[in-house]
Swiss-Prot record:
Secreted listed as a keyword: no
Family per record: Belongs to the class-I aminoacyl-tRNA synthetase family. TyrS type 1 subfamily.
Protein name stated in the entry: Tyrosine--tRNA ligase
Quaternary assembly: Homodimer.
Organism: Mycobacterium sp. (strain KMS)
Length: 423
């Protein structure tokens, strides 16, 4: 039987680790408690958080106990980043975001009374009670400023506009989290993204210096696509959020269904729990029959179900099929239809019009001009609610509007837009 480290290796999920042999030996000796931290720098986690979250889940399935740490304290400070100082949020805002994120964290690991049952902590519970004197004596005394200045992000910031003491001290707070979790739960491994390596190793050193214990560190790779672009950015450039109010399940599904062939197998390794044999079959399908997009559909289905549940997955799959002419639009509930259309483009239709099909195509951006719209119609490339339009004089009747106010326009096979009747 392969070890959890072997599993992570073949999936490509280990970027760096402290003494690998020592870590493997301790994992083999019995259940280990490990943790990963998530700062509430927004009201929701985003897709980039899935790698460490799912790594916690993999460890749990292998018989180990995960701790998910909400950064109620560190979220008020902010880890230094290359783009400059973070805007400090109020304590109430961070507390609200921490509560929301805690609820999201609880979806990804199992909470029960078993030895592997997950634990949720908030680092505000110990950091908030720490006085300035205690922080400087009990934590700061163990850190060399020279070492802290050598961190890549800090060095780049110092070469630019500089860095505040607030963000400079972040490493100390994160390191102290490891000490506290070691004392409270016997935690022996911290995992995080590879950009957190310096902070995590600082925690390993602090545990050794303060408690005399040897603990471990491991990072997962920062996920980029085959073109080097950061994973998890929506088509508009924003984050792909786990909160359905911030990124709809339809938009989430579409992001993954549109994954490039060059990326889809890696994403299946990193973000799903499919076994090696099935992944090999999906890799073969992508290589031999890329037009079928079998792997992309499986990826989108797995991740939408993981984050939003089976009902949401069925709903968005029905919506996707219906919007692209392979299902019944009238069967879609209005919230799903509206969310799907808003991810494309929606033009409003007022009682005063204009409502000629050529005007609607231009208003939604499906055609650059009325002349272009007429040509597309003449070529048979326009449909409304999956019904082909053969006249450039067509106007919608009341009975054409889905749920009394929506039209679905399509140009060609994949260009979709909506019209919403208002007023």
């Amino acid at each position: 039987m392969s070890s959890i480290l072997d599993e992570l290796d073949w999936r490509g999920l280990i970027a760096q680790s402290t003494d690998r042999d020592a870590l493997a030996a301790e994992l083999a000796a019995g259940p280990m408690t490990l943790y990963s931290g998530f700062d509430p720098t927004a009201p929701s986690l985003h897709a980039g958080h899935l790698v460490p979250l799912l790594t916690l889940r993999r460890f749990q399935q292998a018989g180990h106990r995960p701790i998910v740490l909400a950064g109620g304290a560190t979220g008020m400070i902010g880890d230094p980043r290359d783009t400059g100082e973070r805007t400090l949020q109020t304590a109430d805002t961070v507390a609200d975001w921490a509560d929301r994120i805690r609820g999201q964290l609880e979806r990804f690991v199992e909470f029960d009374e078993s030895p592997t049952g997950a634990i949720v902590e908030n680092n505000l519970s110990w950091t908030g009670a720490l006085s300035t004197i205690e922080f400087l004596r009990d934590v700061g005394k163990y850190f060399s400023v020279n070492v802290m200045l050598d961190r890549d992000t800090v060095r780049r910031r110092l070469e630019g506009e500089g860095i505040s003491y607030t963000e400079f001290s972040y490493m100390l707070l994160q390191a102290n989290d490891y000490v506290q979790l070691r004392k409270r739960h016997g935690c022996a491994l911290q995992i995080g993204g590879s950009d957190q390596w310096g902070n995590i190793v600082a925690g390993v050193r602090l545990v050794r210096q303060k408690l005399g214990d040897t603990v471990h560190a491991m990072t997962t790779p920062l996920v980029t696509d085959s073109e080097g672009k950061k994973f998890g950015k929506s088509t508009g450039g924003g984050n792909l959020w786990l909160d359905p109010e911030m990124t709809t399940p339809y938009a989430w599904y579409q992001y993954f269904i549109n994954t490039a062939d060059a990326d889809v197998v890696n994403y299946l390794r990193w973000f799903t729990f499919l076994e090696a044999g099935e992944l090999a079959e999906l890799e073969e399908a992508t290589r031999d029959r890329p037009h079928q997009r079998t792997a992309q559909r499986r990826l989108a289905r797995e991740l939408t179900t993981l984050v939003h549940g089976e009902d949401a997955t069925r709903s968005v799959e029905h919506a996707s099929q219906a919007l692209f002419g392979r299902g019944e639009l009238a069967a879609l509930d209005e919230p799903t239809l509206a969310a799907a259309l808003r991810e494309a483009s929606v033009a409003e239709l007022t009682p005063s019009g204009p409502d000629l099909i050529t005007d609607l195509l231009v208003a939604t951006g499906l055609s650059a001009s009325k002349g272009a719209a007429r040509r597309t119609i003449a070529e048979g490339g326009v449909s409304v609610n999956n019904m082909k339009i053969d006249s450039d004089e067509w106007t919608p009747q009341a009975s054409d509007f889905l749920h009394g106010r929506w039209l679905v326009l399509r140009r060609g096979k994949r260009n979709i837009a909506g019209v919403q009747r208002v007023g």
